[in-house]
Swiss-Prot record:
Residues with the Phosphoserine modification: 132
Domain PH: 212-309, 361-456
Tissue specificity of this protein: Widely expressed. Expressed in C2C12 cells (at protein level).
Cellular compartments annotated: Cytoplasm; Golgi apparatus; Cell membrane
PANTHER family given in the database record: PLECKSTRIN HOMOLOGY DOMAIN CONTAINING PROTEIN, PLECKSTRIN HOMOLOGY DOMAIN-CONTAINING FAMILY M MEMBER 3
GO terms, biological process: myoblast differentiation
Organism: Mus musculus
GO cellular component: cytoplasm; Golgi apparatus; plasma membrane
The name this protein goes by in its record: Pleckstrin homology domain-containing family M member 3
ZnF (Phorbol-ester/DAG-type) intervals: 669-722
CDD domains: PH_PLEKHM3_1 (cd14674)
Pfam families: PH, RH_dom
Function: Involved in skeletal muscle differentiation. May act as a scaffold protein for AKT1 during muscle differentiation.
Length: 761
């Protein structure tokens, strides 16, 4: 393309000069400009006048909407709002320095630069405005060096939606009853928008890079103040918050996923130097996030609150109710503590509410620490309903409760001062005394009040029910249901101490009453008999000296003797006699070293597990034959450390090992004779002698625990690293690793550099 001559564009320059001259003359009439050493000062009226017009016309929802990529809170103090408004335009001193470098004898274009700069600054504010909260604060004079701009923002805002929202003044009038803190507007990125959206520059070919990821970046997380910080990679989607762990090679593996509907509160703690986002889930468990910089943490808190806000449809209608809620945390200074609370009743249905009838009417739920018989505190998730107090494993509310107590039989709720801790309290039931500890004294008081209220309400409702049904026969008072509930409570209590050694607590802990029938025992009321399974005391009617194996004594001491237990304990042990509830590897893995019969059984079960992989991949008739021989104890094939009380008794009597030997003999004969299974062997990669090896030949072979490769036992004993594991590690290396070694990209040549040193066998 040929260059244009000067004469061809001079008319356009003359018209432009006349236009800017008219604009400058209007500014001179409005404000008298001061001349300081030949530098023209920019009038401050232009920026504030334009900003005021925009706010009065309702063109923008908030001052922060001048930023392109992120929205700021619109319900904060006027002092913070004014600071943001002043920093929307560049500082006056910076413009003076830039224009001061130009001499007075430049061409007419340079002479007009000072007067026209404000015009371009206003007209092009969409190009020059900051892209997020971090960029907005980059231009303030109080900015600290070393701050790194976050590049994890991938949100694209539909500006036609933003510009059409109500102005800031109207929104503040409608939200006078809202929280005194920092409040985020509704997220515009979750709204529906046309397929082609015109941005600030008129570009309609705008495409989202990550449509399902609202924010991502590297964070450090921990679950409470006692745990350690763990580095991970986080991704925020419209419904989940995903965390990925990083291995030594930089690969990302999914570590944990949190549903946004389970978040109860989101807080950005501390002042401007804070780097932590504190969240509370529906079960009162904590999740803390720490970013690389304070403003990055602030941005994470904003994005997280916006998405949680949009994930809960009923939340907008509950803002007035939330402002008067006593459970919210109010802070005096919103610039130092940015706390955002969300009422739990406005959340979507959590797993606690998706349960049977006994899980409904939840009054309170949270994490409490229970004092076990080993004199240590163990965390449980307690759920208090109108009828029951239940304890679950943390994060496993969909499973059956470990403990379950009827609230109507609660005897007392009192403070526990034995340990000198003000957050400990006791909940006394006829069959047990719960010693619990909360995280703070306030939470302990809340739990005590909730328990007392629930117990009084349950007793009063039961009394009213008895008065109403006074003339009815006793068999119509749901006696069967009451006995069923009592039996279920006893069963769950006994199940929680299945592998726990019992300790005698004394008759004082039971208020000198029988744990079975509540009859007075001790002293002159009758002899008290102790149950060796639970450690509770019973009367002569509830304890008739029945003998039974104690699972905890077998697991921890390999004590195979029978001890006297109560009727309730015997009924429970007979009920779970054939249930695989005891995991030796989890409870006491050292037992295999001291109990030779148990070590023999676990070796046979390991062989049977290896044979199962062969037979279950063969014909269906063969797999069915193996399943029939082992029925109904198929867990013997899959989980080699899981036992029932009947299995342990057979181990003691020496009957389980011969039974497993017969099944192994049948499966081994099939593998050797089957044309399909016999071809699924291994070759020792250390000696490479061509002999076919099978993993169930545990005497002559050894198997790698990482990759599952099979070698000769003699070859593996030479402490040679597994060739397959080494090969897999080399395949994970990046190309930069091989370039540093001056090796071609060929994998065979690269792996040949790391030959293993071993003697030929």
């Amino acid at each position: 393309m040929e260059a244009l001559e000067v004469d061809d564009i001079s008319p356009a320059l003359e018209v432009t000069e006349d236009f800017f001259s008219t604009f400058d003359s209007k500014l001179e009439k409005a404000v008298q400009q001061a001349e300081v050493y030949g530098i023209q000062e920019v009038p401050e009226l232009v920026g504030h006048e334009v900003l005021g017009n925009i706010a009065d016309n309702g063109a923008l929802r908030s001052v922060a909407s001048l930023g392109k990529g992120t929205m700021i809170w619109d319900h904060c103090k006027s002092r913070l709002l004014e600071t943001k408004a002043q920093n929307v335009f560049p500082a006056k001193e910076q413009l003076m320095v830039q224009r001061g470098t130009a001499p007075d004898n430049l061409s007419w274009m340079a002479q007009k630069e000072a007067s026209t700069f404000n015009f371009f600054n206003i007209c092009q504010r969409r190009r020059d405005r900051p892209r997020s909260v971090n960029d907005l604060l980059d231009e303030t004079t109080t900015f600290k060096p070393g701050h790194a701009r976050s590049r994890s923002d991938v949100t694209h805002v539909d500006w036609r939606v933003v510009l059409s929202t109500m102005p800031l003044q109207q929104q503040q009038q409608q939200q006078q009853a809202s929280l005194q803190g920092i409040h985020f507007p509704g997220p515009s990125f979750l709204l529906s928008s046309p397929s082609k959206v015109e941005d600030a520059q008129g570009n309609t070919e705008h495409k989202q890079t990550f449509p399902n990821i609202l924010k991502k970046g590297y964070l450090e997380i921990r679950k409470n103040h006692d745990s350690y910080w763990q580095s991970c990679y986080a991704e925020l989607s419209p419904y989940n918050l995903n965390f990925y762990s990083l291995d030594s090679s930089g690969n990302q593996n999914l570590y944990a996923t949190y549903q946004l509907s389970h978040f109860q509160s989101i807080s950005v703690l501390g002042n401007l130097e804070a780097r932590m986002v504190d969240t509370v889930l529906y079960d009162n468990s904590q999740l803390q996030l720490k970013a690389e910089s304070p403003w990055e943490a602030l941005d994470w808190g904003q994005k997280l609150w916006e998405v949680v806000h949009a994930a809960v449809p009923n939340y907008m209608g509950r803002q007035g109710e939330m402002a008067n809620s006593p459970g919210l945390i109010h802070h005096g200074d919103c610039a130092q503590n940015h706390c955002l609370q969300k009422k739990s009743s406005g959340l979507l249905a959590s797993p606690v509410l998706d349960s049977p009838k006994q899980y409904q009417n939840i009054l309170k739920s949270g994490t409490l620490y229970r004092l076990t018989v080993q004199n240590n505190w163990k965390a449980f998730t307690f759920v208090l309903s109108k009828a029951y107090l239940m304890a679950f494993h943390p994060g496993k509310l969909d499973e059956d409760p470990l403990l379950s107590y009827n609230v109507d039989v609660c005897l007392a709720v009192q403070i526990d001062n034995l340990d000198g801790c003000d957050s400990c309290f006791q909940v006394i039931f006829p069959q047990d005394v719960l010693r619990l500890r909360a995280e703070t004294r306030q939470r302990a008081q809340e739990w005590m009040e909730a328990l007392k209220t629930a117990a009084n309400a349950a007793r009063s409702s039961e009394q009213n029910l008895q008065v109403t049904l006074r003339n009815k026969p006793k068999d119509q008072l749901d006696g069967r249901e009451l006995r069923k509930n009592k039996r279920q409570s006893v069963t769950t209590s006994f199940l929680s101490i299945l592998t726990t050694l019992s300790l005698e607590r004394g008759l004082t802990a039971q208020s000198f009453k029988c744990a079975g029938c509540q009859r007075s025992i001790g002293l002159s009321n009758g002899k008290a008999k102790v149950c060796n399974y639970s450690g509770w005391y019973y009367c002569s009617s509830c304890h008739v000296d029945d003998s039974f194996l104690i699972p905890a004594r077998i697991v921890h001491n390999w004590d195979t003797s029978k001890y006297k237990v109560s009727k309730q304990a015997k009924e429970f042990l007979e009920y779970v006699y054939e249930e695989p509830l005891i995991d030796i590897q989890q409870e006491n893995p050292m037992l295999y070293l001291h109990a030779e019969p148990l070590a023999t059984v676990v070796r046979l079960r390991q062989r049977l597990k290896s044979l199962r992989a062969y037979l279950f991949s063969c014909r269906a008739a063969v797999a069915e034959d193996l399943r029939r021989r082992i029925f109904p104890r198929e867990y013997l094939l899959q989980q080699i450390h899981l036992y029932s009380l009947a299995d342990l008794q057979q181990v003691i009597e020496g009957k389980l090992a011969p039974f497993l030997g017969k099944v192994i003999k049948f499966a081994t004969a099939h593998v050797y004779s089957c044309s399909l299974c016999s071809q699924k062997g291994f070759i020792c990669e250390i000696c490479n002698n061509g002999e076919i090896l099978y993993p169930f030949e545990d005497i002559s072979t050894s198997r790698c625990e990482s990759c599952g490769a099979v070698f000769h036992s003699e070859c593996k004993e030479k402490s040679v690293p597994c060739p397959r594991c080494v090969r897999r590690e080399l395949q994970k290396k990046q190309k930069s690793f091989w370039r540093q070694l001056n090796v071609d990209e060929s994998l065979e040549e690269a792996c040949a550099m790391f030959e293993l040193s071993y003697q030929s066998t």
